[in-house]
């Protein structure tokens, strides 16, 4: 389990890398959003990474996701804001200028398919290896 607060100096932050990686995975239809989809993907071991909203009100949701991630040894990142996670996962409507409107709160997102090689993906993988 990894907290998203740590930031390597001189590089993009972990949250910036996470945002880019989620955007790439979303374009390649590689995200499972919400508790139901995420728990199924984690249980089937289809997940490469899991992102959990720390501010989730249901403690049972958090315990389930943390338990599935630790059981299957899937990296877990916690983010502080569910609205921000919902925006990164594509649970919003974009207006003409490209700004997010009507953002839906998201409790959990699982990356099933990274999409393509990217610097954000490599940074996250290096981050997971150094935090273990």
Curated annotation (Swiss-Prot):
InterPro entries listed in its UniProt record: Ribosomal_eL30-like_sf, Ribosomal_eL8/eL30/eS12/Gad45, Ribosomal_eS12, Ribosomal_eS12_CS
Keywords: Ribonucleoprotein, Ribosomal protein
GO cellular component, one term: cytosolic small ribosomal subunit
Listed Pfam families: Ribosomal_L7Ae (PF01248)
Single GO biological process annotation from the record: ribosomal small subunit assembly
Entry's Gene Ontology molecular function annotations: structural constituent of ribosome
Disulfide bonds: none
Lineage top rank: taxon: Eukaryota
Family label: Belongs to the eukaryotic ribosomal protein eS12 family.
PANTHER family: 40S RIBOSOMAL PROTEIN S12
Protein's UniProt name: Small ribosomal subunit protein eS12
Organism, as annotated: Blumeria hordei (Barley powdery mildew)
């Amino acid at each position: 389990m990894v907290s998203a607060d740590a930031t390597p100096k001189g590089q993009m932050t972990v949250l910036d890398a996470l945002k880019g990686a989620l955007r790439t995975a979303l374009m390649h239809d590689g995200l499972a959003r919400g508790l139901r989809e995420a728990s199924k993907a984690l249980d089937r071991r289809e997940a490469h990474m899991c992102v959990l909203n720390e501010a989730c009100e249901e403690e049972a949701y958090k315990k389930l996701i943390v338990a599935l991630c630790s059981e299957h040894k899937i990296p877990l990142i916690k983010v502080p804001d569910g609205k921000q996670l919902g925006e990164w996962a594509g649970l919003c409507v974009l207006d003409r200028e490209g700004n997010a409107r009507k953002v839906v709160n998201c409790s959990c997102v699982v990356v099933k398919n990274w999409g393509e090689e990217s610097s954000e993906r490599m940074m996250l993988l290096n981050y997971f290896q150094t935090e273990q």
